[in-house]
């Protein structure tokens, strides 16, 4: 058996918006290429000049870079290959694989209306298709023709889809496809074929909204002497309401998830499971995913977006992240809240303290605010309502115990234990007033850990203000 060098591609149209379903269409071909030590190519299908902008392309590249989907080639822009498409159109005209069609838009619309009135499926009737012995209509003056591919008549297009199994489409269902518009610009399905052939794409892994394009592309490719790639059409990604995921249906963009404090590895893990599985594995690294990925494990049923599952996964990744790396990822969110991470407690320690309870980087940054706020200026009323007079003697003894304790979690825990026993108190009766004295709130992580991060001197200074 000959060795096949795997080459896959992600070929989006740049619309300026990329959601999770779009990115999944990039992730799977990337993973397949990486698993097989092949090549992954980014191709920008920008022949729709009205919708395509460089800013829109940048959004795609930014999302892929954030997820770590590295490229071997690209981005390759279709509009930069226009001369190549024109060259192939001319070859097809010269060889009889294509022909000019002078049918106007009005004539096509009239034909479509007549067919629908007769309960027929709308289709091009082959008026300008050259056949032996057929007399073509006179060429109208001043009309620029479209160029149509001369599709096979009779028979079927059959391919074995890596996800959907064998698919067969009758050629009678397929029109003579327009491959170049009257202004000379090539059409989507034609460009795709030439690109896939020129770039030697071996596997086309894409959404199942492209299934209807596949027989047309196969016929053009075979007519040009090419070998069709392996096709794998991924089932649709549905939103949490069961509708197809789209901007129109309220899908969040990848940028939105970035801004909401999701980690790229959590998003990648989540996307991997939207239509693919490896046993019962729920949480896995990018490296494990690449090692396990194969087309045989792709699901056939639509995958439904589950925001709660994504948030849970993000929590798992935050919880298991290296504190140094997590602190770096959190800094932009902290700075946006006005936190100066360079002054005050060690930010890595603060993040390490907060990460086990946080679902997003924003939640970590919100929690970190406590440690960088000025010393609370508590009123007498606040002190009376939150720090009972009966606890003041215990707080005084706690200050002494903290002063002589080892500055560790264990040391401070021992100091609390000593004072609790001395005053016959339960932990909440002492810990809650301490929290309030330190932060003007009773909602904090474990108090012994808080003291380590805050530092002994700052903690004693704040406690002393309420026990004078």
From Swiss-Prot:
Gene3D superfamilies: 1.10.10.350, Glutamate-tRNA synthetase, class I, anticodon-binding domain 1, HUPs
Chain ranges for the short sequence motif 'KMSKS' region as given in the UniProt record: 244-248
Swiss-Prot/TrEMBL keywords: Aminoacyl-tRNA synthetase, ATP-binding, Cytoplasm, Ligase, Nucleotide-binding, Protein biosynthesis
Membrane-spanning residues: none
Example of a GO cellular component annotation carried by this entry: cytosol
Any one of the GO BP annotations: glutamyl-tRNA aminoacylation
EC number: 6.1.1.17
Enzyme superclass (EC): ligase
Gene Ontology MF term list: ATP binding; glutamate-tRNA ligase activity; tRNA binding; zinc ion binding
Main location: cytoplasm
Residues that coordinate or bind ATP: 247
Cited PANTHER family: GLUTAMATE--TRNA LIGASE (PTHR43311), GLUTAMATE--TRNA LIGASE, MITOCHONDRIAL-RELATED (PTHR43311:SF2)
Stated family: Belongs to the class-I aminoacyl-tRNA synthetase family. Glutamate--tRNA ligase type 1 subfamily.
Official protein name in the record: Glutamate--tRNA ligase
Organism: Polynucleobacter necessarius subsp. necessarius (strain STIR1)
